[in-house]
């Protein structure tokens, strides 16, 4: 666990995403899945069903669990994926930004549009990535992730869309969220096209995954997930990892799980606040 070979590292650097089969032990995957199932009945502060009230199915999400749930902190430490992130990003140290759970039931039509994680996160750097651990089978029919290969190298950050508010004018998004979001959204000139409709221009790839498989991707890599038109529930957990050059970069449009007042860091500081960003791996 946590080991990548030279070819995998080279692919990650070129494509911004790699598929690592059987990256996490099956017993740990089952233990994580049991904890995730329990979250649905008793979600955390940031958890809940993201589907509209009258929509079929369920798109459950929860995040930032490791500070309040010892089991989720242990999962991050024992998965071996921080070491994998260190190898992929060529970092000596890896800190945990947050964990993020996704559960999508069959028939759920809710989806994530094309996006990069960068504009939603209050950090910046070139050694920042996610490991998306499959807890169930998933394929293109059942909402497996899709990526635009090489998009992390474009030196472009696309306009963010916010869950359940996709396509709305920025002012309407701001009314639903918080002050300043409209101006933040409008500061991005590039708007994501339908990359999948232009195979001659963009290299879109998806991966069929089994429980224990991991998708490791750069936080600048464009990605999305579609509806679950399969017959089984799709569940996964992501850990967001910060490598050596990650800095604190608060943004008005960033996820409010960690705010300026929550950390001792000043804008532009290297991430060193152990209380808020625990060191999971060091070498």
Please report, for each region that a protein language model flagged, where it lies by residue.
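Non-heme Fe(II)-dependent double-stranded beta-helix
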Residues: 1-15, 21-114, 119-122, 252, ...
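Non-heme Fe(II)/2-oxoglutarate
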Residues: 46-51, 161-163, 211-216, 220-283
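Short, charged/polar surface micro-motifs in flexible loops or helix N-caps
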Residues: 81, 91, 106-108, 138-140, ...
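Generic beta-strand structural signal
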Residues: 92-94, 98-99, 110-112, 127-133, ...
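A short secondary-structure junction signal
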Residues: 108, 113-114, 125, 141-147, ...
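Short, conserved beta-strand element in jelly-roll/cupin
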Residues: 115, 122-140, 208-211, 216, ...
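Glycine-rich phosphate/pyrophosphate-binding beta-alpha loops
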Residues: 117-119, 128, 223-228
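Double-stranded beta-helix
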Residues: 140-221
